[in-house]
């Protein structure tokens, strides 16, 4: 298909080698659209390029995850070291950040990383104010909220979206035990406040005598201190002292703690749903089945089409659950898409929102009306921006 001067130019802010960039470029190619221009966060942070220099009326800006790239992680940690932290969470200096070397799976000061990422988002937001034209798929402000689990949870709760009960601010294992006792809660999820992809997630349960923590986190001692590493292999800790050490270390970087709600079962496993909402409508839905409490697909859990689940639920219950996901996105008016983690209760009749994922739309091999999520987003974005003649051509 020949290109027109008025055709859209997608601009991606992302690590250039990200698989997300590759998948998005493939979707554009399938639609016979021009490849996206890729700008790294590193170039923006260094001032080598600015958005007003490159955006015009045909520009469609998409922010992608800066994750899985050590240079980006290091840059955001360095930026976070320069942000004032009033809550006294763990941090390291700019010089210490520069001395870091890559260690596969290591959790590196996630609170400080978030402060840096939020500062980068604010830089982008400021540059967008100086852009006279162009569209943004998801605004930096919305992304910052989605990446702050306590703040996002509070937003949903305040707008009457059902979420698991929060146990409030926790700064230590001792505080966790006290809060669980006071809330009459024997099972909780402890999550890094700014983690993603099950990073730093602990499913903890106790009856007061016995303790069990299921987690993706491996603990290792180094020079008298704990280092935490993410792993695809789930670990189960039963020693209270080990669990206390794990929780205390996570608390140094800010955590979100919520009640562990029972999930529905299917094929001898429990599951939750990942729902991709695009332009206000629930599109792609996939069930994530796991024998453990943690269902993330990258942990080699099984995915399942949702027809069997729809058959178990009443039509009204299914429609209501999808409508809830669409309601969630109305709380993020600057966001065109997101991935929502949805719990279905054991009786298949109720649901609760577990998380809102700014970059939760990557679901390779999951289709909606013959389209993957990126293709659906591109076509829906073109429709929203009134490029109907282009849609007719593709």
What is each model feature region?
Residues 2, 122-254:
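Active-site nucleotide/adenylate-binding loops and adjacent lid/helix of ATP-dependent enzymes
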Residues 297-337, 344-394:
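C-terminal active-site "lid" helix and adjoining low-complexity regulatory extension at the edge
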Residues 17-19, 68, 194-197, 262-263, ...:
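Short, solvent-exposed loop/turn segments at secondary-structure junctions
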Residues 15-27, 31, 36-170, 174-175:
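Conserved N-proximal alpha/beta basic substrate-recognition cap immediately N-terminal to
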Residues 274, 341-343:
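Short, surface-exposed charged micro-motifs
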Residues 188, 256, 283-284, 352-354:
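Protein kinase-like catalytic core scaffold
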Residues 207-327, 366-370:
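ATP-dependent carboxylate/phosphate-activation module, predominantly the ATP-grasp catalytic core
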Residues 6-11:
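Extreme N-terminal starter segment of soluble prokaryotic enzymes
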């Amino acid at each position: 298909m020949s290109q027109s001067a008025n055709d859209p130019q997608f601009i991606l802010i992302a690590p250039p080698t990200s698989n997300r960039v590759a998948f998005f470029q493939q979707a554009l190619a399938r639609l016979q659209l021009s490849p996206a221009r890729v700008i790294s966060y590193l170039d923006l942070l260094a001032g080598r390029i600015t958005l007003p220099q490159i955006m015009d009326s045909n520009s469609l800006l998409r922010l992608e995850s800066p994750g899985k790239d050590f240079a980006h992680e290091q840059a955001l940690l360095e930026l976070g070291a320069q942000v004032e932290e009033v809550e006294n969470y763990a941090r390291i200096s700019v010089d210490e950040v520069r001395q870091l070397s890559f260690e596969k799976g290591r959790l590196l000061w996630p609170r400080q990383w978030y402060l840096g990422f939020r500062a980068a988002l604010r830089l982008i937001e400021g540059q967008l104010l100086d852009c006279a034209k162009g569209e943004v798929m998801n605004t930096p402000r919305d992304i910052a909220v989605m990446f702050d689990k306590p703040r996002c949870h509070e937003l949903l709760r305040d707008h009457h979206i059902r979420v698991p009960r929060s146990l409030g601010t926790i700064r230590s294992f001792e505080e966790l035990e006290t809060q669980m006792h006071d809330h009459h809660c024997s099972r909780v999820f402890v999550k890094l406040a700014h983690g993603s992809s099950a990073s730093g997630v602990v499913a903890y349960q106790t009856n007061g005598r016995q303790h069990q923590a299921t987690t993706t986190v491996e603990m290792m001692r180094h020079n008298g201190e704990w280092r935490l590493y993410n792993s695809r292999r789930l670990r189960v800790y039963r020693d209270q002292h080990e669990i206390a050490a794990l929780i205390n270390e996570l608390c140094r970087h800010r955590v979100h703690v919520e009640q562990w709600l029972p999930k529905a079962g299917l094929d001898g496993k429990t599951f939750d749903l990942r729902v991709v909402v695009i332009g206000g409508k629930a599109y792609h839905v996939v069930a994530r089945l796991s024998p453990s409490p943690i269902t993330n697909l990258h942990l080699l859990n099984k995915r399942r089409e949702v027809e069997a689940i729809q058959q178990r639920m009443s039509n009204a219950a299914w429609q209501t659950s999808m409508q809830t996901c669409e309601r969630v996105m109305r709380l993020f008016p600057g966001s065109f898409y997101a991935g929502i983690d949805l719990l279905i209760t054991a009786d298949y009749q109720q649901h609760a929102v577990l998380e809102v994922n700014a970059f939760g739309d990557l679901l390779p091999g999951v289709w909606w009306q013959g389209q993957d999520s990126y293709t659906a987003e591109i076509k829906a974005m073109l429709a929203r921006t009134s490029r109907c003649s282009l849609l007719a051509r593709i």
